[in-house]
Regions:
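Short aromatic/hydrophobic-glycine micro-motifs
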Residues: 32, 76-77, 162, 215
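Helical scaffold of the NTase/Pol beta-like nucleotidyltransferase catalytic core
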Residues: 1-36
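Catalytic metal-binding acidic patch
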Residues: 38-71, 131, 153
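Catalytic cores of NTP-dependent nucleotidyl/adenyl transfer enzymes across multiple folds
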Residues: 3, 108-267
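Short, hinge-like loop/turn segments at secondary-structure boundaries
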Residues: 52-54, 76, 97-98, 115, ...
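N-terminal functional module detector in eukaryotic proteins
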Residues: 12-16, 26-27, 59-62, 67-77
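Conserved catalytic core of two-metal-ion nucleotidyltransferases
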Residues: 72-112
Length: 267
């Protein structure tokens, strides 16, 4: 039984789903724009339904404080867990993530997330979902030892690839286009019968860029930290510059310390 398919269990309503529904009702009654992401949005685009232990809500960074205040005023517990990307709302053992960027600081929630949002029914309500392009963009960088979202990216490409706004997706990745290309290569390997889901012109353009790349011997920067907060710490200790810091990234030294100290803890 999945949360998406059933709101009720034997003997009454599932308390966790009731928490999600109450939280969504509260937000929907406010004037704060928000999007539903995570398992709910993933299921809408891929038809892959799986159990979830939390609810992911996406808001603009400028709306995070207002969002938490809505729940504070209604008796929920709130916290700004990681100031560069994540807050949480709790009631009892249940919680909701309030997301305004990605853990590496790259996928910041901006107006485009809302402009291109799709509508769907979530727990009986018509709500807006994170666009598939933004889901691919943010998930493509999640490559930890304990969590790799590559399969999610490939499933999104398989089911939504022909309808994606590819120019917009390429713009989202920007200078990080090799990350997108790596997933497109894997997609062709995993689904040889669905290669037409990815425009040939996109693959052709990216592979030409790859062929034109030259070694940058003087550029001692490690972009691996955009993919994993833990697996490239050795490289930083060896003198590489962390790509999450300006001018390449948007995190501060304090953000990095807090995010690194949380390694091994449940986010």
């Amino acid at each position: 039984m999945t949360l998406l398919a059933h709101r009720h269990v034997v003997g009454g309503e599932d308390p966790r789903v009731a928490f999600y529904a109450d939280a969504l009702d509260l937000l929907a009654a406010s004037d704060i724009p928000f999007l539903v992401g995570g398992t709910f949005a993933f299921a809408r685009y891929t038809e892959i339904h799986r159990e979830t232990k939390d609810l992911d809500i996406f808001v603009r960074r400028s709306d995070c404080t207002r969002t938490l205040r809505v729940f504070d005023d209604s008796g929920y517990r709130t916290e700004l867990t990681y100031p560069h990307w994540l807050a949480k709302v709790r009631r009892g053992e249940d919680f909701m993530d309030v997301v305004f960027a990605s853990g590496n600081g790259i996928a910041v929630v901006d107006d485009e997330w809302f402009t291109h949002a799709a509508e769907s029914e979530v727990l009986g309500m018509r709500l807006r979902l994170c666009p598939p392009e933004e889901m691919i963009w943010s998930k493509a960088f999640v490559q930890e030892r304990e969590r790799f979202d590559g399969a999610d990216v490939l499933h999104l490409l398989r089911e939504a690839g022909k309808d994606l706004d590819w120019p917009r997706l390429l713009t989202r990745f920007g200078d990080h286009w090799p990350v997108l290309l790596s997933h497109l290569v894997l997609f062709g390997f995993v689904y040889p019968d669905r290669r037409d889901c990815v425009p040939f012109a996109v693959v052709d353009a990216l592979t030409k860029r790859l062929a034109e790349q030259k070694q940058e011997s003087a550029n001692r920067i490690c972009f691996g930290t955009l993919l994993s907060r833990e697996q490239y710490l050795h490289d930083l200790a060896s003198g590489y510059v962390d790509a999450r810091l300006p001018p390449h990234g948007g995190m501060t030294p304090d953000d990095l310390r807090l995010w690194t100290d949380a390694i091994g803890k449940r986010t």
